[in-house]
């Protein structure tokens, strides 16, 4: 077995190599003057079990193409089994057609990864588990909640886990079980034209004096988290901690979250982060459990 470190790993390939004691080989990579990517596997590998690590954080399209180049090159070398480890799976939120003629982007992405030569796919906390069926082969989902819970437990006294929507309820349950805490959810609706998020309904919440942990799979612009934070304080929360597996922090989302009352943010290294601003949890142990 050998680990191939791609062009967008954020150190996960190196950490994984140490945890499972498997050698790491980094791809050679450069960018041509016209912006196209050059990829080379620096030694001939054949008849091996391969683990390819490549996250699809921004620039997503470039990192995706580079993943395909790596996979097909390894497939051409006639290897036994190729596992694509994609910590952050871009386009995963485009899993349904809300309007006629829209691209079903996640289907295209997963089909391409399979065709390029991946036999197995490992992802961290997908937006929706059912969307992974488009890969058409073996899929493993690595769960980082034990690692996230370990960090969160250091920051709370009376934890209450809150999902910002019904879709995140199962995620909230998993974190709550790790923290031995209660959990609930907020009902929301999103305008498909403007992207605006509105709270539709609030189940009865007993948050007075509680340290509320709002957990979601992804922070993009932060709108969902901000709405949930305001609702938590309106229901008596003592403080709010934001937990997200994948954090993009677009459009000054970090500053907006802090201004909304979020006291701390705990996230992972599936996407590069500034450790002076957020607590960063390594997902490599979660991946190792699936190998």
From Swiss-Prot:
Q: Indicate the segments annotated as coiled coil, or none if absent.
A: none
**Part of which pathway?**
Metabolic intermediate biosynthesis; 5-phospho-alpha-D-ribose 1-diphosphate biosynthesis; 5-phospho-alpha-D-ribose 1-diphosphate from D-ribose 5-phosphate (route I): step 1/1
An annotated GO cellular component: cytoplasm
* Residue numbers binding Mg(2+) 2: 165
Active site at which residues? Answer: 188
**In this UniProt entry, which cysteines form S-S bonds?**
none
Q: Per the record, what are the reactions this protein catalyses?
A: D-ribose 5-phosphate + ATP = 5-phospho-alpha-D-ribose 1-diphosphate + AMP + H(+)
Q: For D-ribose 5-phosphate, which residues are the binding ones?
A: 190, 216, 220-224
According to the record, how does the cofactor bind? Answer: Binds 2 Mg(2+) ions per subunit.
Q: Which GO terms describe its biological process?
A: 5-phosphoribose 1-diphosphate biosynthetic process; purine nucleotide biosynthetic process
Q: Where located?
A: Cytoplasm
Q: Which UniProt keywords apply?
A: ATP-binding, Cytoplasm, Kinase, Magnesium, Metal-binding, Nucleotide biosynthesis, Nucleotide-binding, Transferase
What SUPFAM superfamilies does the annotation carry?
PRTase-like (SSF53271)
Q: Which cofactors go with this protein?
A: Mg(2+)
The record, for CDD domains, names: PRTases_typeI
User: Record's InterPro entries?
Assistant: Pribosyltran_N, PRibTrfase_dom, PRTase-like, Rib-P_diPkinase, Rib-P_diPkinase_arc
UniProt: Mg(2+) 1 binding residues: 127
Residue positions binding ATP = 34-36, 93-94
- The protein's superkingdom reads Archaea
Q: Which family does it belong to?
A: Belongs to the ribose-phosphate pyrophosphokinase family. Class III (archaeal) subfamily.
Q: What is this protein called?
A: Ribose-phosphate pyrophosphokinase
Which organism is the protein's source?
Answer: Sulfurisphaera tokodaii (strain DSM 16993 / JCM 10545 / NBRC 100140 / 7) (Sulfolobus tokodaii)
Q: Which gene encodes it?
A: prs
């Amino acid at each position: 077995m050998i680990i191939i470190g791609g062009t967008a790993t954020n150190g996960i390939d190196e950490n994984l190599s140490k945890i499972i004691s498997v050698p790491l080989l980094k791809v050679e990579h450069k960018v041509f003057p016209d912006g196209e990517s050059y990829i080379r596997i620096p030694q001939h590998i054949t008849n091996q079990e391969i683990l390819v690590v490549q996250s699809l954080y921004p620039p997503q399209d470039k990192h995706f193409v580079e993943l395909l180049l790596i996979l097909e090159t390894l497939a051409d070398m006639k290897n036994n089994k190729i596992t694509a480890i994609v910590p952050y799976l871009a386009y995963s939120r485009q899993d349904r057609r809300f309007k006629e003629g829209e691209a079903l982007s996640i289907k295209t992405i997963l089909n391409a990864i399979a065709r390029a030569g991946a036999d197995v796919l490992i992802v961290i906390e997908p937006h929706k588990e059912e969307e992974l069926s488009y890969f058409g082969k073996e899929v493993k989902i690595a769960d980082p909640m034990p690692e996230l819970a370990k960090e969160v437990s250091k920051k709370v006294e009376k934890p209450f886990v809150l999902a910002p929507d019904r879709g995140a309820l199962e995620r909230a349950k998993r974190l709550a079980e790790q923290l031995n805490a209660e959990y609930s959810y907020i009902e929301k609706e999103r305008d498909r034209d403007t992207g605006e998020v509105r709270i539709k309904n609030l189940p009865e919440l007993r948050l007075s004096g509680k340290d509320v942990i709002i957990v979601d799979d992804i922070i993009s612009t932060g709108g969902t988290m901000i709405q949930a934070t305001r609702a938590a304080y309106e229901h008596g929360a003592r403080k709010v901690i934001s937990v997200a597996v994948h954090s993009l922090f677009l459009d000054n989302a970090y500053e907006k979250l802090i201004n909304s009352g979020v006291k701390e943010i705990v996230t992972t290294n599936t996407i590069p982060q500034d450790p002076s601003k957020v607590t960063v949890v390594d997902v490599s142990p979660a991946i190792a459990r699936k190998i």
